[in-house]
Amino acid sequence: MSSSQSTSQLKRKQQTISSFFSKKPVAPNGSTTTTPKDGHVKKTIGHARVHEAPSSEMDVVDGAHDAAVRPDEEGDDDYQIILPSRKRIRSNGEVSTLQRGTLADIDNGHSSKGENELQTGIMGSSDSDRAEQPVKIKSGSSRTEKFRFSSSSLPSSSDPKGNGGCDVLYAISADGDASEDGDEEQKRKQALHQKFVKRLGGPDCLPFSVSRVDAGDAEEAEGAESDAEAEAEIVPVPQKGRGGKKTTTGKLTPMERQIIDIKKKHMDTLLVVEVGYKFRFFGEDARVAAKELSIVCIPGKLRFDEHPSEAHLSRFASASIPVHRLHVHVKRLVEAGYKVGVVRQLETAALKAAGENRNAPFVRKLTNLYTKGTYIDDVEGLEESSGNSGSASTSTGYLLCMAESNAKGWGNDEKVHVGIVAVQPATGDVIYDDFEDGFMRSEIEMRLLHIAPCEFLIVGEMSKATEKLVQHLSGSKTNVFGDKIRVERVSKSKTAAAESHSHVSSFYAGRMNAKGTTGDVAASNLLEKVLTLPEDVTICLSSMIKHMSEFGLEYVFDLTKYFQPFSARSHMLLNGNTLTNLEIYQNQTDHTSKGSLFWTLDRTKTRFGQRLLRKWVGRPLLDKTELEERVSAVEELQDPSKTVQIERLKGLLSKIRADLEKSLIRIYYGRCTRPELLTVLQTLQLIADEYVHLKSPADLGFSSPTITTAIAALPAIRDDVVTYLNKINEEAAKKDDKYCFFREVEETDEITESNLGIADVQHRLQEHCAVAAEILGKKKVQYTTVAGIEYLIEVENSPYNLKKVPASWRKISGTKKVSRFHTPEVVQYMRERDQYKEALAAACDKAFHALLADISTKYQSFRDCILALATLDCLLSLANIASQPGYIKPAYTDKTRISVQRGRHPMVEQLLLDTYVPNDIELHTDETRALLVTGPNMGGKSSYVRQVALISIMGQIGSYVPADSATLGMLDAVYTRMGAFDNMLAGESTFMVELSETADILKQATPRSLVILDELGRGTSTHDGVAIAQAVLDYMVRNLRSLTLFITHYQNLSSMAREFPKGELRNVHMKFTESGMDGQDITFLYEVGEGVAHRSYGLNVARLANVPDSVLEVARAKSAELEEKIRKKKMLALAKVAKGFINTDGDAGGPAPALLERVMVGLEQL
């Protein structure tokens, strides 16, 4: 067989190996090939013979890699990348030469005589063979370096055998006679051979199968470079131990060192790290993220302290998410209560390649921190969508800081001084307060329930009672906020007060200097206001400034205009028990907003309107004038004669899709995106344009000053908004195109300079087409783009055309028809263009943030406009409620009075399908100021008293009320003591909690308060319970003179009404009818009637609760027995009174009035 025929046959049989080279392997000079009967090919190279396997056997080893390199051999594949030939492999500074045709045979792993000859052929070939066309390449990555020959495999003078150190593989004599070795030696060779194949046998392990692209090349992608870092981390570099054996190293990769350095500074944070085109979690963070996000976690090291227990692991555990899904997953982690940090790459591939650190890993830094209270990077935030689903938690997004000091007293006499600062980063609102609290911590609880924070920041140590309260409110997802609350703690030094005052002073002085408002009188007054805050509040404010600085949100404290004290007495006080018992913000069943008073009144169309209405509900007005103005506005907004103006307002609100309040504060923080900024400005322009034509308030068509003032504030911002919109390219902003975001006339010098540089490079690239055409001998050459690689020059695959291609041109890709090249000039121009693009991106970002800063100077005027719009939204919501049938406008009086005819429970009425039974109520400080309410269990007593309180609260919010008529006085507070529960954490029984809350009410209530007490005294014996209930009720009526609703099952208390001849205390009961044998069946009428219900009908409730009949029979018998005993005692007592009445001396003027009353009471009870 001729040499040419054998060569073509060899090519067909070695398809997998030929795919690794740009040129087909050619047999060296002097080589001959023969084909024996067994189908194996013997090829002689010099004096060595090569025994090769058929291609079918070779495909088993390398077929997978061949398919990866050449996905479609027969088709015209545009994505086939031609890899350069690799003939020499650098290892430890030396060069070894391998013939192309031999590595495939090594890879096959045959243990035959021909293989022995192969090894001698490799190691024993002449110098002239090794010098044949050497190709040197740079040392590869740690992944490929693992699989390279070491210099020990080359012949050296120190080698006693003179076989080039072939003991590492296996040494064979030049003539290939394997029979000269003994059986033991042959086994040793076989074992060494298998070890070699195991090391070099995988398709991915061939050193020349990995594409080697110079790091300085312009076309090198950023993601590829970053992913290479990840590969380096996943596959560590093995090194030799002392005994020559390979051991796994504990050496960290550069990226691992970066991660550990950042993690050590933020051990309480889940880090998500940008690596190329993915964000990755490492170590324990990966395990947590995989659990919360339901993503895959690749096993590995979990600890970051290089603990010996994980020495057997060579990499960190990891989990990854796509870049475009970052905020989706971050939001889920934040909602789960974690603190999440985003670590980003701070340099791009193009600038990195041109810089001095081109061979170093990407610079990474923690750029964002998020928690529940500080997550504002998503305009949707963590709130539910606008509507009335009522399924979300009632948290408001406040971050509350609390400090406690001066604990004095012990037990029930304990007093603590508390300071709080609560900030809502999404809106810029700041609430502060300073107060003293008792051992029940009712003041703290009230503020926490009102503010409903999503995150606590505790400064220093708390007392046990306060600590237990915080744990109770934040410990689980079933707490009163309906969600788990994050708690962070910071230390408090002994000199905290002085340090905090100094820190706050320097912070605001620095902010004023930066803004240039040092001499501004208004700014100085606001600064004075901040610096005169109480000591504990200042400590909290300082801690909050430091805490928010970690998240880049400290600017929120610049807005001192929006600092509001919590305990301003311009509002009705609703304490924690009242908020819970009356279901102001959430129901008591599943702790959602559905069924609450806020849910009932919420008909708002915007998010910022909904937030304002929530404040209105929790802070009813005390100022009668302000209240009447609000109610008049609500009345005017349902006037049929003004339907056109009202519909115009509703249409304007319905067009607003964005949460303007949140977006505005994001602009202030510099966190706003380009599309979001365009949306905000366009929405503000829409709002301003709606009433820009109006010249005076009279043109509005409304007479209410509340409405006209709010509408007049809308057009005031139009000029500023139009000025900013004129700077923006609308189409580019919609597409988030940073390069064309500004109109051409508004571009900065840096942007213009970068654009000119890019244009110049592109011009030179076009001119280079003519040069390339001249070299190729063509009239015209055009660039093409394939697989994202630009400026490729295509050359047809013919010997005539390919001969014209200079050696300096770099082949990038090709098909069967064409090859694609980059010229050195194109590479240089692309590098310049990428550098200009990076500079352009930086200039565009700088200009955009400068625009946001400019808009921030108008924050207060824009915020006032949004607040005016929110006010209109709330008024329209209340008008919607007022338009429902059965709602009337209440009349207000300066006297402490509640007079309601046919009032109804506002929430139960909406939730019940049946008609709600209305009831009357008449309370007045100078007349009847207390009602003693009795009646059967489940008769509607609690619903009745709640209805009275809710109507009073609704009236002072400014809403219409569900009644036929209502006259309401200005109540300063509503206090409730309802329900039975203990406090095991504080070691307090149900009765203890009941009396403690009652004691707080007796201390705080005033003659202008409404007090509701439900079954006081039931937690102890009957005698003690009656005594306590009677004493408390008497104190409420005689001393406090508060409006009181007292529910009880103690019929003996009804006699107290006779002690108040002017009717200050009156008995009422819930009506019912009896039927059936012995009156066992009763029908609840849910109507309030005069008098006392002398039975509670508890057995009826037991029957409704499906208590077993046998138990009911025993209970019924015992009840009858006890009633009979009591009846006999009363008859005996009445008989004695009657005897005394008969024996009374007629000359004395008849029986005493007290004696007559006792007779009447006895008869009434019987």
Swiss-Prot record:
Compartment annotation: Nucleus
Keyword Oxidoreductase: no
Predominant place of localization: nucleus
InterPro entries with a match to the protein in the record: DNA_mismatch_repair_MutS-lik_N, DNA_mismatch_repair_MutS_C, DNA_mismatch_repair_MutS_core, DNA_mismatch_repair_MutS_N, DNA_mismatch_repair_MutS_sf, MutS, MutS_con_dom_sf, P-loop_NTPase
Domain of life the protein comes from: Eukaryota
Region (Mispair-binding domain): 246-373
GO molecular function: ATP binding; ATP-dependent DNA damage sensor activity; mismatched DNA binding
Regions of compositional bias (Basic and acidic residues) in chain numbering: 62-72, 107-116
Keywords (A to Z) from UniProt: ATP-binding, DNA damage, DNA repair, DNA-binding, Nucleotide-binding, Nucleus
Pfam families referenced in this protein's UniProt entry, alphabetically: MutS_I, MutS_III, MutS_V
Region (Disordered): 1-165
A GO cellular-component term linked to this record: nucleus
GO terms under biological process: mismatch repair; mitotic recombination
Segments of skewed composition (Polar residues): 1-21, 117-126
Binding-site residues for ATP, renumbered to this chain: G935, P936, N937, M938, G939, G940, K941, S942
Quaternary structure, from the entry: Heterodimer consisting of MSH2-MSH3 (MutS beta). Forms a ternary complex with MutL alpha (MLH1-PMS1).
Entry function: Component of the post-replicative DNA mismatch repair system (MMR). Heterodimerizes with MSH2 to form MutS beta, which binds to DNA mismatches thereby initiating DNA repair. MSH3 provides substrate-binding and substrate specificity to the complex. When bound, the MutS beta heterodimer bends the DNA helix and shields approximately 20 base pairs. Acts mainly to repair insertion-deletion loops (IDLs) from 2 to 13 nucleotides in size, but can also repair base-base and single insertion-deletion mismatches that occur during replication.
Family: Belongs to the DNA mismatch repair MutS family. MSH3 subfamily.
Protein name as catalogued: DNA mismatch repair protein MSH3
Organism: Ajellomyces capsulatus (strain NAm1 / WU24)
